Regions:
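Alpha-helix boundary/capping residues
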Residues: 33-36, 57, 131
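Active-site cofactor/cluster-binding pocket
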Residues: 45-80, 84-85
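Short catalytic-loop micro-motif centered on adjacent basic/acidic residues
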Residues: 41, 62, 94
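Mixed-charge interfacial surface used for oligomerization/domain docking
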Residues: 1-12, 68-72, 76-81, 90-93, ...
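A short alpha-helix capping/helix-coil boundary motif
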Residues: 29-31, 58-59, 88-91, 135-138
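N-terminal glycine-rich anion-binding loop in soluble enzyme alpha/beta folds
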Residues: 1-45
Length: 168
């Protein structure tokens, strides 16, 4: 759908960069990262990436991965301010998903439903805020290895969790 544009995160190693878009082969990435022994890192989209995605739209609904794990929300917030200052008649509804999982897709689908129903911009933003109060997904990580490799978890904690077969 041309109205839905992804602004991807990136996972990097000293050997390769993985861009989280439709061309990413997740199985290959997981296999390669599992065998990679070096340090990995993540990079959120920058303000320019968000501005490019906003394009020339009159209404933008920007959904970000949780601000507690990524700088995506902050970069999108700066882009929103720049966009609305440059184009005073355009609006950006910035949504911190407070999630790192499928909840982003649920929010997207709800926005599509509200747009299709003909709601105005402000109503949609308010409805999404209310909708988020009732959408909470819980998931479990099989391993903490990648989190340790990119500095988000102490490597000793990841090792102990693996030895004890603890899933978080």
């Amino acid at each position: 759908d041309k109205h839905i544009i992804s602004v991807p995160l990136k996972i990097t190693t000293d050997k390769k960069e993985y861009v989280d878009d439709e061309s990413l082969d997740i199985e290959v990435m997981i296999r390669e990262l599992a065998s990679y022994k070096g340090r990995s890192g993540t990079a959120c989209p920058g303000t320019g990436d968000w501005l490019d995605a906003f394009g020339d739209a009159d209404w933008v609904f920007a959904i970000t991965i949780t601000s507690t794990l990524s700088g995506s929300y902050n970069a999108a917030r700066v882009a929103k301010e720049e966009y609305e200052n440059e184009y005073p008649n355009r609006k950006v509804c910035l949504i911190d998903s407070l999630s790192a999982g499928a909840e982003l897709k649920l929010i997207q689908e709800k926005i599509e439903e509200l747009v299709a129903a003909g709601h105005d911009f402000d109503t949609i933003c308010n409805e999404i805020t209310e909708y988020q109060k009732h959408t909470h997904l819980i998931f479990c990580l099989k391993s903490l290895t990648n989190l340790a490799n990119n500095g988000r978890v102490n490597p000793a904690v990841a090792k102990i969790a693996g030895v004890l077969n603890i899933h978080v």
